[in-house]
């Protein structure tokens, strides 16, 4: 799987990924290929993937989860900046309309925790204040993510002091 991610940084990456898909047609191979395809640092690829996450997905929870796992890369922070806000805009609907398993996978993969910034924490805390207790999984997930993000911010602040 790691070699597929590495391929994306090489010349002829798309052809190499296609060859890997032919070489390993198993479920594991399909999931690895989806992670790799969604990891492409291209705005159109990210937009199409986000819409699929919100819509029909990639055919199954496992394949969709794999694709979501390839979406966020810390080295793509500028490209992914709009999706931090979109996460908060879409979260309530995801938790209201989708299965528990999907909602949890969506949150774990797409919460913008790679952006260890006070602004993201503040936005997440404000959002938490608006979430109904009728969505306990979302409330709990936000509390846990906020705690993790706050610890990461404090660690970075300490490291630079």
What are these regions (language model features)?
Residues 4-161:
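Long, ordered, helix-rich scaffold segments
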């Amino acid at each position: 799987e790691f070699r597929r991610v590495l391929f994306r940084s090489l010349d002829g990456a798309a052809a190499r990924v296609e060859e890997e898909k032919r070489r390993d047609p198993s479920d594991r191979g399909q999931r690895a290929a989806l992670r790799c395809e969604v990891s492409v640092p291209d705005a159109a690829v990210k937009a199409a993937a986000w819409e699929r996450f919100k819509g029909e997905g990639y055919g199954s929870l496992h394949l969709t989860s794999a694709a979501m796992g390839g979406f966020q890369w810390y080295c793509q922070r500028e490209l992914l900046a709009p999706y931090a806000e979109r996460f908060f805009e879409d979260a309530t609907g995801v938790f209201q309309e989708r299965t528990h398993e999907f909602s949890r996978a969506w949150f774990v993969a797409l919460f913008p925790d790679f952006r260890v910034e006070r602004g993201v924490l503040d936005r997440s805390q404000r959002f938490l204040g608006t979430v109904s207790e009728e969505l306990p999984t979302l409330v709990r997930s936000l509390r846990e993510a906020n705690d993790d993000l706050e610890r990461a911010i404090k660690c970075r602040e300490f490291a630079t002091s």
